[in-house]
Amino acid sequence: MSMPFYVAPEQLMKDRADYARKGIARGRALIGAVWEGGIIIVAENPSRSLHKLSEIYDRIAFGGVGKYNEFDQLRVAGIRHADLKGYAYAREDVDARSLANLYAQYLGTVFTHEMKPLEVEILVAELGNGHRESQLFQILYDGTVMDEREFAVLGGDADAIAERFRALYDASGPRERLLQSARDALSGQRPPIGADDLEVVVLEDRGERRCFRRLEVDEVREALGDQPEGSA
């Protein structure tokens, strides 16, 4: 009788982590950053229809990198959770920390117990108010949660991008400068990424309940000082 095939738990976890990291590294990166006027999230994304960034609730935004269908399912689940909690209790009870913990529990369970881990990293951003500071939560493929106060970088080549962005980051400057810094950090040694290949959202307190706003291509182009494609 043949002996059953044995893999050490340490090796199994390492293989799963390597598998997830390789899948995430193939995706284009994003940067989320806090500045004195709110939160900006900038993602390299040439698609106009498949969004990597979206609204979760009044003051909460979501960003995902990696396998699109996997992080989009998590986005939808987060919206449902936030809506139900806000309906059952109060809108003020919906916060990024509890949502990040929910994502972390799910990702950790899948990583530990399922055959294939999810090839995703998630950003949950919440605009602060009088009671809470602005927060950025980065959730990794294995359920690890990192609480960032200034900025977070997700996706392929994240360490190098974070190093470039750290040298440019200025929380007291205007939003346009922060957007330019994010574009420069994402571009690296390549030619600057064009406005058409960037997805940009902001969380800003404009005196309304909803703080999420998606910047149109023309707004991004103007902020970056780029010329429209085809113009002389």
Swiss-Prot record:
Activity regulation (record text): The formation of the proteasomal ATPase ARC-20S proteasome complex, likely via the docking of the C-termini of ARC into the intersubunit pockets in the alpha-rings, may trigger opening of the gate for substrate entry. Interconversion between the open-gate and close-gate conformations leads to a dynamic regulation of the 20S proteasome proteolysis activity.
GO biological process entries: modification-dependent protein catabolic process; proteasomal protein catabolic process
Keywords, comma-separated and alphabetical: Cytoplasm, Proteasome
Entry GO CC: cytoplasm; proteasome core complex, alpha-subunit complex
Location within or outside the cell: Cytoplasm
UniProt cross-references to InterPro entries, sorted A to Z: Ntn_hydrolases_N, Proteasome_alpha-type, Proteasome_asu_bac, Proteasome_sua/b
Gene3D superfamilies: Glutamine Phosphoribosylpyrophosphate, subunit 1, domain 1
Pfam families: Proteasome (PF00227)
Biochemical pathway: Protein degradation; proteasomal Pup-dependent pathway
GO molecular function: threonine-type endopeptidase activity
Complex formation: The 20S proteasome core is composed of 14 alpha and 14 beta subunits that assemble into four stacked heptameric rings, resulting in a barrel-shaped structure. The two inner rings, each composed of seven catalytic beta subunits, are sandwiched by two outer rings, each composed of seven alpha subunits. The catalytic chamber with the active sites is on the inside of the barrel. Has a gated structure, the ends of the cylinder being occluded by the N-termini of the alpha-subunits. Is capped by the proteasome-associated ATPase, ARC.
HAMAP family (UniProt xref): Proteasome_A_B
Function noted in UniProt: Component of the proteasome core, a large protease complex with broad specificity involved in protein degradation.
Protein name in the entry: Proteasome subunit alpha
